[in-house]
Amino acid sequence: MDVNPTLLFLKVPAQNAISTTFPYTGDPPYSHGTGTGYTMDTVNRTHQYSEKGKWTTNTETGAPQLNPIDGPLPEDNEPSGYAQTDCVLEAMAFLEESHPGIFENSCLETMEVVQQTRVDKLTQGRQTYDWTLNRNQPAATALANTIEVFRSNGLTANESGRLIDFLKDVMDSMDKEEMEITTHFQRKRRVRDNMTKKMVTQRTIGKKKQRLNKKGYLIRALTLNTMTKDAERGKLKRRAIATPGMQIRGFVYFVETLARSICEKLEQSGLPVGGNEKKAKLANVVRKMMTNSQDTELSFTITGDNTKWNENQNPRMFLAMITYITRNQPEWFRNVLSIAPIMFSNKMARLGKGYMFESKSMKLRTQIPAEMLANIDLKYFNESTRKKIEKIRPLLIDGTASLSPGMMMGMFNMLSTVLGVSILNLGQKRYTKTTYWWDGLQSSDDFALIVNAPNHEGIQAGVDRFYRTCKLVGINMSKKKSYINRTGTFEFTSFFYRYGFVANFSMELPSFGVSGINESADMSIGVTVIKNNMINNDLGPATAQMALQLFIKDYRYTYRCHRGDTQIQTRRSFELKKLWDQTRSKAGLLVSDGGPNLYNIRNLHIPEVCLKWELMDEDYQGRLCNPLNPFVSHKEIESINNAVVMPAHGPAKSMEYDAVATTHSWIPKRNRSILNTSQRGILEDEQMYQKCCNLFEKFFPSSSYRRPVGISSMVEAMVSRARIDARIDFESGRIKKEEFSEIMKICCTIEELRRQK
């Protein structure tokens, strides 16, 4: 039977058809090889946008620096970073005038945060540049290494556990004439294997002490490591992103806390809220503009795109903003907040791994590390790479490039949003002093501009004025990529607005399916995704029911756990049939044990174990929830876990799901091959730190403590806690005298060992 596709849309309003335009099936592209070329592109482009600025040399590091601020005025059409300080300050002043007390209140909120934040805040976040090893590491390890090095160099303010005290150490470290660090290295030896009599390569991991002079240390402290951004759809070229080191992170965190607090109070800001809350906030602004444009006014909306937002931003502008925002605050607070932009004005971009060369004739491959790019003969490179290297050479120091202008991706999202909103704020009639006026939405580099005026000429004049005002603070609206429409239809941060925000359900499609973590988590994530889409994305009941059935089918095929009474033969079917036959209450079996599916769209919020608990045989309950099961290495039991789900557009989202720990919540073991590489020493450090943390949590069962940082302080805490507990237990008769003295002896031994070390 032929179906006429137009029939499908007879009852559907046009805006709902957006889900049928979904282009993103299949996997997104990932980057391979090094990001060195992309990073050089970024550095060269950033300097090109500011090329008419003034060159100076940093007295400490000798790095050449370009300062475009308060230089030439920007030109029409060409993107540039020529911001004017007085324009930025004036925009800030007007923002404060239309929001009385906003800066004052945000400063007070931030001051409280600054005094209360613990160092362990910095353990959040994924890969971080670890300056001690000069490469990326998980955040917790990078922090532990930094603190360990600080302490061995006599910087101990961090022992209080407050982030602000750790930052005091960072400041002191920059005044030191030298810093001593421990690095990992590996030796390779060719030895004969006794068994096979063949020659094999033996690797040994060593640690060695290394001294960094002031210049060397400062360069590392100011370095942002770069990587290639993965999984970007709809782009032909990859681009570089940056990960700052621990010295910068803490300062950035406080600046962003202040900016976040300001953004929360600005109705035009699309940050820091998300999802439905964001849609509601933005819909308000649109409603305001539409109701105000009575019959006499026209209203148009620009779906905006800025050219190279962060390469034209300038840390010096951010410094000016912070200086203004905090102008009546205590000196210490102003100093803490101004350090991040100052560090960014002096930042160095690490060029990554370097280039890989291969000779087809000799079947040889060799890596040219970034450090060698400064003086290698350029005849080996192709034309475009040669140009890049020639351009970047004057900026190179030790494999890093001096990059004073520009912000690198994703660093000051909140603060740059404040800057954007301050220009939107200037669109009020009392500031434009003419018949046109504007308002809009800003979320990091994405914006939507709504202009109202009595006629088309007025609209054009308003857009022009907005465009030029933006230029003066280093924001470059792209005329090529922005488009204008009657208000009521526009796109902003991948939300499509047509008389209200349209649910674009197809964006969520990639996150449906089986995640592949383990049987327990996958079931939970799968039903949670369906539940969330019913709440947020207009997923109707019939479609949801179908999605659920497809998910269960997918799940059973993934884990080969078809129902016990099925005819499908898999590797597991023999065992599952046996279980099915000996189970009295078959409804109680989990789907992953060949049980039936009891989920429907009404009970998606209940974890499967809870849903079936009353239906389970007693011995099945005992096997399922058995922490002593030797075949399962358990995660610590938490009621809520976080999964990373990939929407089609935008960053991977973190999604909470209920985690009931059972024998199905297994964790796959770590790949062995890492143990033969130079990472091994680092891995061992990480495992030791992890073990120490786990032990620490056994000692302090209350949830009130915050995990301390660095191994040494934990050991002290545990020893003193052990002594106190032992004394209490001994005096109340819970332990014998022999046990008590043995505990005391162990504590003394530990302290003795620490003294010798």
From Swiss-Prot:
What general EC class does the enzyme of this chain belong to?
A: transferase
**Protein location:** Host nucleus; Host cytoplasm
Q: Which UniProt keywords apply?
A: Eukaryotic host gene expression shutoff by virus, Eukaryotic host transcription shutoff by virus, Host cytoplasm, Host gene expression shutoff by virus, Host nucleus, Host-virus interaction, Inhibition of host RNA polymerase II by virus, Nucleotide-binding, Nucleotidyltransferase, Phosphoprotein, RNA-directed RNA polymerase, Transferase, Viral RNA replication, Viral transcription
Domain RdRp catalytic, residue spans: 286-483
Q: What is its EC number?
A: 2.7.7.48
Region (Promoter-binding site) residue ranges read 249-256
**Any Pfam family the entry gives:** Flu_PB1
Q: Which gene encodes it?
A: PB1
User: Which parts of the sequence form the motif Nuclear localization signal?
Assistant: 187-195, 203-216
Assembly, per entry: Influenza RNA polymerase is composed of three subunits: PB1, PB2 and PA. Interacts (via N-terminus) with PA (via C-terminus). Interacts (via C-terminus) with PB2 (via N-terminus); this interaction is essential for transcription initiation.
Q: How is it modified after translation?
A: Phosphorylated by host PRKCA.
GO CC, sorted alphabetically, is: host cell cytoplasm; host cell nucleus
What ranges does the record list as Polar residues composition bias?
55-64
Alphabetical list of InterPro entries matching this protein? RNA-dir_pol_NSvirus, RNA_pol_PB1_influenza
> Any idea what job this protein has?
RNA-dependent RNA polymerase which is responsible for replication and transcription of virus RNA segments. The transcription of viral mRNAs occurs by a unique mechanism called cap-snatching. 5' methylated caps of cellular mRNAs are cleaved after 10-13 nucleotides by PA. In turn, these short capped RNAs are used as primers by PB1 for transcription of viral mRNAs. During virus replication, PB1 initiates RNA synthesis and copy vRNA into complementary RNA (cRNA) which in turn serves as a template for the production of more vRNAs.
GO terms (molecular function) for this protein are: nucleotide binding; RNA binding; RNA-directed RNA polymerase activity
Chain positions covered by the region annotation Disordered: 50-82
**Is Nucleotidyltransferase one of the keywords UniProt gives this record?**
yes
Extract one GO BP annotation from the record.
Answer: DNA-templated transcription
- What family classification does the UniProt entry report for this protein? Belongs to the influenza viruses polymerase PB1 family.
Q: What is this protein called?
A: RNA-directed RNA polymerase catalytic subunit
> Which Gene3D superfamilies does UniProt cross-reference here?
6.10.140.720
Source organism of this protein record? Influenza A virus (strain A/Gull/Minnesota/945/1980 H13N6)
Which reaction does this enzyme catalyse, per its entry? RNA(n) + a ribonucleoside 5'-triphosphate = RNA(n+1) + diphosphate
